[in-house]
Amino acid sequence: MELRYGAIATEGTVLVRAFDAVQNQDLETLRYWNQWWSAWRDTEELRNQSWQMGRSLCRLGGALEPGLVPYVQACGEVCNFVIAFGTIAAYWQLPLPDVVSAYLYSWLSNGINAGVRLIPLGQTLGQQMLLALHPSLEYATHKALTQEDQDLGGWSHGMGMISSQHESLYTRLFQS
């Protein structure tokens, strides 16, 4: 469900917008989508997670490709991970469908790997789940590539409420 209707589905479309902005050398549009994604996040914890990962990826990207610096600076004080990912992929002229699919697959794989460790599911079952979810991954990739701006939005089954509770915990299993 999350791949079809959740935040990650919207994130895929935001990745496409960032990629297109860099391809068109449109720094204002890149800044807009970075701010849009920051505002769209449900909780401070989710925003901070995205900013921290984005900051790290921007640092790495800038060290590898000095030409990326203007794009990173266009984002302002903070750069979301999805924006940094799309920016670097576009700068390297990677095929957009592959970039979106890889991004969404990474999200899916990380979630299943957490389940393999915590539940425990076992490695084989985890791989079977990845394989079974391939049609949903293809759907989400297609949706991200074709979705119009006015159709953006998501439904994450209480993710915002859970994140709100999680960000106030004294001890956590995973850094967010």
Residue ranges and their predicted role:
Residues 1, 30-37, 157, 175-176:
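Conserved catalytic-core motifs characterized by acidic clusters
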Residues 1-18:
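N-terminal low-complexity or amphipathic/hydrophobic leaders
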Residues 2, 41-44, 48, 102, ...:
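Short, solvent-exposed segments of well-ordered alpha helices
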Residues 3-7, 73-76, 102-104:
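A short, ordered amphipathic alpha-helix with a cationic face
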Residues 7-8, 23, 112, 141:
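Short alpha-helix boundary/capping elements
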Residues 12, 17, 24-93:
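Internal, conserved structured core segments that host functional sites
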Residues 78-126:
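A contiguous pocket-lining binding segment that forms or flanks enzyme active sites
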Residues 106-176:
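C-terminal auxiliary extensions adjacent to catalytic cores
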